[in-house]
């Protein structure tokens, strides 16, 4: 559904979770202007009709959640780079429904090459889980594991009870702990092939607007590993060039709201 520039400017300026944006934000015909920089607003139902080539756009971020297949009757993510749209590359901000290179920063970004037209950046939960699994596997070896993500509610749920194809997501998001499915654990095998088939997981949506957690339980190949050893390797990994800024480490007694605005 198309949203006008005035509404987009307002929602950027005033955010219920992160507060008021401290830069000047305004709207004009066909654009919003953020701190003096104009950002064009274009709305098309079919991605092949978007004028990326004319605008000189090299890389498109496909974050609608609608075009998760390369091609389909309603359009696909490759339409951004083929069929006339004219971009050179497309990055999905969600798992793809078909085979595509999946990249999690700090874990599999060495697999990116210039020949790829499209990559998936996986899900938020996979990006949380994969660096942790990578460090544990490289240090101690993972035989198998189970993950639970306790996740903030999202727009895929209902704010009040209302019909939804998933009867649990049909319930008011801010009033219940809502079990739901997740493919994040299995998707780790896409960015860490050596863990393919070794991890599984469940998800709980909880009544917070931001701040989620992954609880990972693993059976390690190395026996008698202590808590201190695990904490030590995670802390050291968080300070490496590979994972600095991606994996964080703290021993503070923090809660989910303390992660709000954290850039890792």
UniProtKB/Swiss-Prot annotation:
GO terms for cellular component: cytoplasm. It holds the Pfam family Gp_dh_N. D-glyceraldehyde 3-phosphate binds at residues 123-125, 154, 169, 182-183, 205. NAD(+) binds at residues 45, 93, 155. Keywords: Cytoplasm, Glycolysis, NAD, Nucleotide-binding, Oxidoreductase. It comes from the Bacteria. Coiled coil: none annotated. Belongs to the glyceraldehyde-3-phosphate dehydrogenase family. This is Glyceraldehyde-3-phosphate dehydrogenase. The active site is at residue 124. Catalyzes the oxidative phosphorylation of glyceraldehyde 3-phosphate (G3P) to 1,3-bisphosphoglycerate (BPG) using the cofactor NAD. The first reaction step involves the formation of a hemiacetal intermediate between G3P and a cysteine residue, and this hemiacetal intermediate is then oxidized to a thioester, with concomitant reduction of NAD to NADH. The reduced NADH is then exchanged with the second NAD, and the thioester is attacked by a nucleophilic inorganic phosphate to produce BPG. Signal peptide: none annotated. CDD domains: GAPDH_I_C, GAPDH_I_N. It is found in: Cytoplasm. The record marks 151 as: Activates thiol group during catalysis. The gene is gap. It comes from Borrelia hermsii. It catalyses: D-glyceraldehyde 3-phosphate + phosphate + NAD(+) = (2R)-3-phospho-glyceroyl phosphate + NADH + H(+). Its EC number is 1.2.1.12. Homotetramer. Pathway: Carbohydrate degradation; glycolysis; pyruvate from D-glyceraldehyde 3-phosphate: step 1/5. Residues 245-264 are annotated as: Disordered. GO terms for molecular function: glyceraldehyde-3-phosphate dehydrogenase (NAD+) (phosphorylating) activity; NAD binding. One of its GO terms (biological process) is glycolytic process.
């Amino acid at each position: 559904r198309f949203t006008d520039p005035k509404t987009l400017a307002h929602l950027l300026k005033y955010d219920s979770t992160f507060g008021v944006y401290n830069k000047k934000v305004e709207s004009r015909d066909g654009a919003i202007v953020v701190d003096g920089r104009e950002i064009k607003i274009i709305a098309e139902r079919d991605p092949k009709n978007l004028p990326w080539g004319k605008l000189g756009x090299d890389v498109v971020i496909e974050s609608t959640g609608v075009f998760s297949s390369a091609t389909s009757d309603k359009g696909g993510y490759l339409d951004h780079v083929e069929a006339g749209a004219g971009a050179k590359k497309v990055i999905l901000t969600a798992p793809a429904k078909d085979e595509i290179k999946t990249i999690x920063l700090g874990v599999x970004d060495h697999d990116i090459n210039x020949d790829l037209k499209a990559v998936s950046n996986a899900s938020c939960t996979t990006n949380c889980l994969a660096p942790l699994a990578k460090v544990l596997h490289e240090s101690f070896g993972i035989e198998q594991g189970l993950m639970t993500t306790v996740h903030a509610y999202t727009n895929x749920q209902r704010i009040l009870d209302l019909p939804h194809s998933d009867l649990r997501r049909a319930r008011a998001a801010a009033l219940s702990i809502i079990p739901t499915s997740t493919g994040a654990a299995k998707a780790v095998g896409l960015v860490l092939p050596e863990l393919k088939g070794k991890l599984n997981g469940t998800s709980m949506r909880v009544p917070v607007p931001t701040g989620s957690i992954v609880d990972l339980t693993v059976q390690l190949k190395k026996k008698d590993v202590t808590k201190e050893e695990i904490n030590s390797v995670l802390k050291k990994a968080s300070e490496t060039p590979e994972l600095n800024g991606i994996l964080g480490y703290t021993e503070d007694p923090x809660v989910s709201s303390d992660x709000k605005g954290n850039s890792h």
